[in-house]
Each structure stands twice: as C-alpha cells, then as structure tokens.
From Swiss-Prot:
Job description of the protein: Excises uracil residues from the DNA which can arise as a result of misincorporation of dUMP residues by DNA polymerase or due to deamination of cytosine.
Protein name: Uracil-DNA glycosylase
PANTHER family listed in its UniProt record: URACIL-DNA GLYCOSYLASE
Group of enzyme by EC: hydrolase
GO molecular function, one term: uracil DNA N-glycosylase activity
NCBIfam families: PRK05254.1-1, PRK05254.1-2, PRK05254.1-4, PRK05254.1-5, ung
Protein's organism: Streptococcus suis (strain 05ZYH33)
Chief location bin: cytoplasm
Lineage of origin: Bacteria, Bacillati, Bacillota, Bacilli, Lactobacillales
Family from the record: Belongs to the uracil-DNA glycosylase (UDG) superfamily. UNG family.
SMART domains: UDG, UreE_C
Keywords on record: Cytoplasm, DNA damage, DNA repair, Hydrolase
Catalytic activity line of the entry: Hydrolyzes single-stranded DNA or mismatched double-stranded DNA and polynucleotides, releasing free uracil
Gene: ung
HAMAP family hit by this protein: UDG
This enzyme's EC code(s): 3.2.2.27
C-alpha cells in the first residue's frame, strides 16, 4: 500500500503514527492466535482496486470468521469454499437483477473498480466483530472519505444498519448512495431482495459517462 495512491491520502485523514499503531496491532493479534484473513490479505481491498479506478463501494462489517473463507474482500470467499448465507443471497439477488454469476470469489469485481471494503479488516477465528472498536474504524472511515473526495462519480452500496451509518461520510453530490436491508437471512426479505443494486449502479455509472461493472464476471 505504501506505493499506491491510497497511502498518502489515507494517512492525511488519520492521527500521526496511526499506520504504526495498526502494524503493532497486527503483530500482536497474529502472534496470539488464529486471525482472518491471512495477514498478507488484510489490505486486499485497496491493493486490488486502484483509487483512480473506484466506481462502486460495497461496505461490509468484518471478515468471515471461519476457516478458509476470508480473503480481504467484503462478502467474497474463494471458489473452493461454499458461499456463506449472505453471499448466497447477494448472488440470488444478482441472478434476479442481471443474471447468474458462478463464482463465489468476487475478485473480478474488485479488479473492475468495485471496492469491497469491510469496516473492520480483521477478525479472530469464530468471533464475529471480535476486533470491532479496536483499531480499524478510523482507518476504514478514512478510506471512505478519500473515495468521497474523488471527482469522478462513485456508487456506494450500503446494506444494513451498520453500513448505512457511514452515509454521513458521503457528502459529495457526484456520488450515488444505494441503501437497503442486509443480505443476511435475518433481513434479506425486509428490503434486500428486489432492491436491484447492481443494475441501479450500472445505470448511474453509464448516465455519468463511466463504464458499468460486468457483475457476472
């Protein structure tokens, strides 16, 4: 990340030496137990999607906490792993909205400019939200603010109450915010299914002169 366009802009949004605190936190937690995703994938979202290429932001809460699932991109798992329930529902809504995507791995979205960002970038094995409130929120809020400052139009897809709180950080009138219930089985039938976020995002991007996302890749 140090050599990317992200680095200095994120750094400018944070207290002095915050990157050092993050590295100390990572050294500590990875030395003390099983943490997901693998350490080399903690920053995968901003390593895979260049700042200049961001077209869509899909905000998650924290990584999957089961073995082999988390890969540093919100909602994504390797194709070798069964899709968790929220991802199953995302793919079901995608099928109803645009068409069938076979992959559970969403890397192809990230490579097209979909920033798949979790608010917390690490999680202890088996402990959902186990690192919430410890180190990550100022960092990921800074990422959202950096994207908010871009001149080109971006679509933010905010699923569920936690993600929707971040709407306060999105102040640039060039951007579009799409909100709905979370794709979790607990809430998917309360406004997620039928929300058509993927076609909505592409319609806005193309209306603003940007190429849409091939969501079926």
């Amino acid at each position: 990340m140090e050599h990317s366009a992200w680095h200095e802009l994120i750094k400018a949004q944070l207290p002095e030496h915050y990157f050092g605190k993050i590295n100390q936190f990572l050294d500590h937690v990875y030395a003390g137990g099983t943490i997901y995703p693998p350490r080399e994938k903690v920053f995968a979202a901003i390593q895979t999607t260049d700042l200049e290429e961001v077209k869509v932001v899909i905000l998650g809460q924290d990584p999957y906490h089961g073995p082999g699932q988390a890969q540093g991109l919100s909602f994504s798992v390797p194709n070798s792993v069964p899709a968790p329930p929220s991802l199953q529902n995302i793919l079901k809504e995608l099928t109803d909205d645009i068409g069938v995507k076979q992959d559970h791995d969403l890397t192809a979205w990230a490579e097209q400019g979909v920033l798949l960002l979790n608010a917390c970038l690490t999680v202890p094995a088996g402990q959902a939200n186990g690192h919430a409130g410890q180190i990550w929120e100022p960092f990921t809020d800074a990422v959202i603010k950096v994207v908010n400052s871009l001149d080109q139009p971006v679509v933010y897809i905010l699923w569920g109450a936690y993600a929707r709180k971040k709407k306060a950080l999105i102040t640039n009138p060039k951007h579009l915010v799409i909100e709905s219930a979370h794709p979790s089985p607990l809430s998917a039938y309360r406004g997620f299914f039928g929300s058509k976020p993927f076609s909505q995002a592409n319609a806005y991007l193309t209306s603003q002169g940007r190429t849409g996302i091939d969501w079926l890749r």
